[in-house]
Design a protein with these regions (language model features):
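Divalent metal-coordination and catalytic microenvironments
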Residues: 2, 18, 37, 77, ...
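Hydrophobic/aromatic beta-strand patches that form the interior of the parallel beta-sheet core
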Residues: 33, 64, 78, 100, ...
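Active-site environment of divalent metal-dependent phosphoester hydrolases
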Residues: 5-8, 33-46, 70-71, 84-87, ...
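Binuclear metal-dependent hydrolase catalytic cores centered on His/Asp/Glu-rich metal-binding motifs
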Residues: 72-126
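Short, well-ordered alpha-helix to beta-strand connector turns
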Residues: 29, 74, 96-98, 132-134, ...
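Conserved beta-sheet core of the metallophosphoesterase superfamily
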Residues: 113-183
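Core catalytic region of metal-dependent phosphoesterases/phosphodiesterases
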Residues: 1-69, 127-133
Length: 195
């Protein structure tokens, strides 16, 4: 989720470059899955109108507007886009038993930022225990972090000073083994603190 950052205005050059990028990805990867994020939607209360609609016509790209459970390589996976209400999220999670959750999630106890060296904790309604035994790979929070079964993959590059000291890159998950590989982004600019 959050392929785009601005929910109300995206420049034409940006639109064209993103379409070209996903067409390129589509030629390389047979299966590209995107969960709708809160910055991809027009209305805060609905995933119906989204900037991601422009990508749904590209081969091999699948966009999740609503939560869906699928079996992939023998593993039960929940694809969970942005849900505006913690109560709806809890209700959904109570009704599923899955191996993996992939989504745009706001989970209590997760660190929101490294800004100014102060750790900000989100005290939301959904907790790591609500996911039972599932391994959770989540977006929404920009910094990479692991807390038991919760894995925020973070942004692939630094966006602001709050990313200082946090590794950026891409996480690759092998569903058959459950093992991950992190490839650090050593190309993009980084925010650093100078003493």
């Amino acid at each position: 989720g959050d392929v785009f950052d601005n929910r109300s205005c995206i420049g034409l050059n940006t639109i064209n470059r993103v379409i070209e990028l996903f067409e390129h990805f589509s030629a390389i990867f047979k299966d590209i899955r995107i969960t709708v994020g809160n910055h991809d939607i027009y209305k805060k209360s609905s995933n119906d109108i989204t900037s991601l609609n422009m990508l749904k016509y590209i081969p091999n790209v699948k966009i999740y507007y609503e939560p869906i459970v699928e079996v992939i390589d023998g593993k039960t996976c929940l694809f969970n886009p942005w849900i505006e209400s913690a109560e709806k999220e809890k209700e959904l999670l109570a009704g599923v038993n899955v191996d993996y959750v992939f989504g745009h999630l706001e989970i209590g106890g997760s660190q929101m930022s490294n800004r100014s060296g102060v750790k900000i904790e989100f005290a939301g309604g959904v907790k790591s225990s609500d996911f039972k035994d599932a391994q959770v790979y989540a977006g929404h929070i920009h910094i990479k972090q692991d807390n038991r079964n919760i894995h925020y993959i973070g942004n692939p590059y630094h966006k602001d000073r709050g990313d200082r000291g946090n590794p950026k890159g891409v996480t690759i998950l092998d569903l058959s083994t459950g093992k991950t590989k992190f490839i650090e982004n050593e190309v993009s600019p980084r925010y650093m603190k100078e003493n």
